[in-house]
Amino acid sequence: MSAILDAISTALYSYILIILLIGVGLYFFIRTKALPLRMFGESIRVVMEKPEKGSDFSSFRALMVSTASRVGVGNIAGVATAIALGGAGAVFWMWVIATVGAASAFIESTLAQIYKHRSPHGHSFGGPAYYIKDALRSKTLAIIFAVALIVTYMGGFNLLASFNVNQAFSAYSWYNASYTPYIIGGLLGLAMAGSIFGGTRRLSDITGILVPIMAIIYLAVGIVVIALNWRNIPAMFESIFASAFDFKAIFSGFAGSAVMLGIKRGLYSNEAGVGSAPNAAASASVSHPVKQGLVQMLSVFIDTMVICTITAFVILSSNIEITGDLKGAPLVQNAMATTIGSFAGPFTTFALLLFGFTTLVGNFYYAEVNLRFLFGDKPTPHWVLTIFRAVASLLVFAGALLEFSVAWNIGDILMGLMALINLPVIVILGNKAIRCAKDYQMQRKQGLNPSFRASTIGITQKLDYWQD
């Protein structure tokens, strides 16, 4: 099974997704005139705005939910795996994917805001399934995407998050492969159940507290480790760029190259263009759709350019030998141990627990939004939600028992299939988001707090929001 999954993953990323991801990202980067760079400062301003009157789901809350999913085990275990298998050059290609991918993230999240729906309780919700159905008018494709997202996030990604949390404990002497994974999986499953049975409001409360705390603590310790290894920093950068452009090594073994691993782990970590973050973006109450496009663009930068980069620099500045035998969380633990000693193990484990748990919670939010889509205008039966949440908790338990290659390949394949649907869709619908961006920039130049009406960009169909 492991060999089959590996072959599928390699084919998917070698021949299809690498072209789509970079191609679509570059297309939107150029079409928006480098918007991720031009409007970076504006994205920081927008995220601090209060929600629109009558709503309590702010841009900051939406940022925390999407960042909870983006900022997870991929920022530690994923980056370490990419470096262990693809070399230091994988870091450079993660940066590339984040820069061009931020443009895709802007487009998909702006579209999610334009086509968001209003619940009977007055809350907004939406995502790719909704803009596929409403803008493309393809209910069949929308259902396929919703099912793909549920399987990917509640299944593949949460299996992988649980696996990586379990891996963080494997370095301890008391760890026993025969029964410890069952204990860790069981505890994670119970914690997951306690969170998700409280509903999406509780999820946003949990992530709004945990995400900033875990990110700040991890960054602070990472910066200390890098500072203590300052003598190795010049060699570290030399290694990153030399490995990134070693084309002989790249094309002689593309499946395990820096490019491939950088793209895989970069996509797994920042999710730009995959179609996940728009589900959080649609929930925010803002005066203009572009505001959430900017916020989700910022989330990509926080994830890759800040947190993933800190992990990479911790590993590469430590000057430990990277052979490929040691990968994932144990590699980060060994790198940190060169400067902070025995504190490295408990700290990395604690970080992975927080990163992993918020990933589980954020992923489930996306899955539940798409489950509700499958029931259309009808309320999702309570018994269905109960079974759905119970299955999600059981899958978290099962993830701790998986093998390394099986866990990562399942996540990569399912994520790739989602991107194969969402990327062509946002190319088709992208002009609407680009016109929306021009409308926003024009109002900002006039000194206004931008507001939006769908008719100003040529949308005449009936929407739940943005009507005259």
Please give the residue ranges for each predicted region.
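Membrane-interface loop-to-helix entry segments
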Residues: 20-27, 31, 35-44, 149, ...
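Alpha-helical membrane segments and immediately flanking helix-loop junctions
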Residues: 53-85, 111-129, 133, 150, ...
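Transmembrane alpha-helical segments of multi-pass small-molecule transport proteins
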Residues: 19-23, 142-149, 173-198, 217, ...
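Hydrophobic transmembrane alpha-helices that form the core helical bundles
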Residues: 85, 94-98, 102-135, 139-175, ...
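Extracellular/periplasmic helix-exit of transmembrane alpha-helices
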Residues: 29, 107-116, 120, 221-239, ...
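Flexible loop linkers connecting adjacent transmembrane helices
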Residues: 34-59, 81-83, 87-88, 103-136, ...
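Transmembrane helix-loop junctions in multi-pass membrane proteins
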Residues: 17, 31-36, 75-79, 88, ...
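N-terminal alpha-helical transmembrane segments of multi-pass membrane transport
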Residues: 1-73, 83-90, 101, 427-468
